[in-house]
Structure formats: C-alpha cells, structure tokens
C-alpha cells in the first residue's frame, strides 16, 4: 500500500462470475497485496470463524476487511446507479472502533460474526453487523432547504437514498475518527465511465 495506513482494496471477479478475489493494501501497480481472499459467489458470502487468530500478514488467510464478508457485497456499482436502482443492502465503514474494551465475539452480530481482535471497541459504537435503515417515510424528492436533505438530492443520491430506505446499510468496517463511508465502485481509471 501507500505510505501510511491505507486499505487500497481491489476486487477481481472471474469472467464466469463464479469467484471473486479481494485484495487488501494492494500496491499501486496491482502486483502485490498484504492479504488476498477468494470467495465462491455461489455460497452465502460469509467466512467461517478461523481456528487461529486473524493474521493480516499472511496473504493466504484472513479477510480483507475487519469483518468476514466480501468487498463486493454491499458495494454500490456504476451499473446499478446507471440502471436507476440498487437491490441490496449497502455496506459502510464508521470510525467507531477506537479505544475502550477489546473487540470480541460479543461486539459483532451476524453476518459480521467474526472480526479482527486487534482493533478496539468504542463504548458508543454500534456493533459490527448492525443494519441501519433510512426512514422509508422520508420524501427523497423534497427539494426544500428546510426538508430532511437541506435541498434537492441529485439523481445518484436519490438512488442510494432509496436503497437505504428499502434495504438499509450494514456496518462492516472501521474507518477514520468521526467518518462514515458507503462503499462505491471506483471508476477513476476507466475513461468510459464517470460519476459526474
């Protein structure tokens, strides 16, 4: 990865769409990573608990995020937004796992039933695996500055808001302090696609 702490995550999907490989702290040229995890897309997408402690330094074992779910699951893709709908829960990272008691099996819920014991839990943080839902009664078309959005949502924001109302979002990863991030496909290196 880059100097300093970065996830530098990467996902590769097999041409037959049967397998996906997650990469953690991938070098910019994509030739090296600190961890690699292969997932079978015909399974439930949830890793089994490890018989030994999580070891991020071993590229043959471990997950590429704090929780045992693939990077692809919960990802907002370019194709979904262009199609105008997202038909699954989103995954998000939050800066709530910092200080306090050691993170243990009792501070996560399914599907995040195992987690990295090297990170610490903030007493005010939700448990990994908790699902949050945007109030389905909120009007995503409200354009008033006094409404719930403080103005009009863009077309893409409406698609994400609708998915949050219908499916919610699941807490799967730690992020920086006071930071909340929804996972969205990076199209930076594809000149044919743009989020703008």
Language-model features and meaning:
Residues 181-196:
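Extracellular low-complexity, O-glycosylation-prone Ser/Thr/Pro/Gly-rich "stalks"
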Residues 2-165, 169-176, 187-188:
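A surface/extracellular/periplasmic glyco- and lipid-processing/surface-interacting theme
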